[in-house]
Amino acid sequence: MATFKDACYHYKRINKLNHTVLKLGVNDTWRSSPPTKYKGWCLDCCQHTDLTYCRGCTMYHVCQWCSQYGRCFLDNEPHLLRMRTFKNEVTKDDLKNLIDMYEILFPMNQKIVCRFINNTRQHKCRNECMTQWYNHLLLPITLQSMSIELDGDVYYVFGYYDNMNSINQTPFSFTNLVDIYDKLLLDDVNFARMSFLPASLQQEYALRYFSKSRFISEQRKCVNDSHFSINVLENLHNPSFKVQITRNCSELSFDWNEACKLVKNVSAYFDMLKTSHIEFYSVSTRCRIFTQCKLKMASKLIKPNYITSNHKTLATEVHNCKWCSVNNSYTVWNDFRIKKIYDNIFNFLRALVKSNVNIGHCSSQEKIYEYVEDVLNVCDDERWKTSIMEIFNCLEPVELDDVKYVLFNHEINWDVINVLVHSIGKVPQILTLENVITIMQSIIYEWFDIRYMRNTPMVTFTIDKLRRLHTGLKTVEYDSGISDIE
């Protein structure tokens, strides 16, 4: 049983404020939600279990029970998850406010302890205190958090997360902020709470506290496409696809890290809850993470033999050729931009090969093929440039004044001609390595200009950013045949 979840269940009965703040979906009637096999900690109830995707950010961070309330750590409504979420620079005063909130919501005194002990129905002698009966009293106050970095902003979701060594398939990593506060001050807070417990429970409380307050922070994870809902990934091939998200909002006027102070003024807190509402947004999937996902999918389907072939058709339109025919049944080809990039890249590469190397048929086995497999993966800059350099070297370049040149005198299509004119100002007869890199980047950047793309999708934006973009009609950046350059 998750300690934080149990504490919320029992403590929500002590007053009206707690009944509102500590209400968790996991402690209420179960409602069905999409099942998944992702393992990790639910940010809402802090238990380690199977996770489903959040309706606010499409990432996997909520359990199937808590998903019924649709809470996200990026919300603007002061629910418990939002009040436990801190952003970027966290100060000692911020952590003091967090500890004060814990003390208000989970008080520990003689009256509370006696009340819980008397209300507990034990199956053995009442004089014997067992941890499974009093799990809710064994919630220490720690500065343990799950952190994530989203486009330069770092979020810390504080809580009490059991079983830290369990499988974690989420983009969140454990971070300990006790050094920002003060170990001794935090010790005093917990020793004072522990003193009200029966002697048989004090040792367990101490073990839990020290294990969660003295651990070494994990290295922060990189967010990738696998951390987002499979429903989003399955529709990436559609250029006009928009992600539907919902956010819980209110007229929250505090600074981000001061939301936890709201519980100190109960009447003001309930007044703010009266302004709570749900906002709906349709946002674009355009970002580096999803772009790299699509380009990698296309890279797996590459037929490098086309660059030595004599086919009169475009690379994606070759049929009945054992070495060059692309399997068009994959959904990645439904995105016309991917097909354009693939056709133009291979039209340009074939012109380079035919201009410099005497290879007459696509059935021949050439060393250059092994370097062609990475020509679409421009998001991995170092690996991509290495593959282009190896391709260039396979063309047997001529060195003149420490600069290597290759010929370029084979026919190309009109799309590639336009790219050449825009990128280097003319259709040249010779090319350097830098020219080749520039041209191939331009072919890809025409449709996916990753230089100006955010890393994560807009679903990870805060409410303030979403509102500003919505006002400027920029939340839906779908393409109707319009490229990045246009």
Swiss-Prot record:
Upper lineage ranks?
Viruses, Riboviria, Orthornavirae, Duplornaviricota, Resentoviricetes
The record lists the organism as: Rotavirus A (strain RVA/Human/United States/P/1974/G3P1A[8])
The alphabetized UniProt keywords are:
Host cytoplasm, Host cytoskeleton, Host-virus interaction, Inhibition of host innate immune response by virus, Inhibition of host IRF3 by virus, Inhibition of host IRF7 by virus, Inhibition of host NF-kappa-B by virus, Inhibition of host RLR pathway by virus, Interferon antiviral system evasion, Metal-binding, Phosphoprotein, RNA-binding, Viral immunoevasion
Q: What is known of its domains?
A: The integrity of the zinc-binding domain in NSP1 is important for degradation of host IRF3.
The primary location reported for this protein is: host cell
Q: Work out whether the entry's keyword set contains ATP-binding.
A: no
Any idea what this protein is called?
Answer: Non-structural protein 1
Query: What post-translational events are described?
Result: The C-terminal region is phosphorylated by host CKII/CSNK2A1. Phosphorylation of the DSGXS motif is essential for host NF-kappa-B inhibition.
Pfam families registered for this protein in UniProt: Rota_NS53 (PF00981)
Self-association and partners? Interacts (via C-terminus) with host IRF3; this interaction leads to IRF3 degradation. Interacts with host IRF7; this interaction leads to IRF7 degradation. Interacts with host CUL1 and CUL3. Interacts with host BTRC.
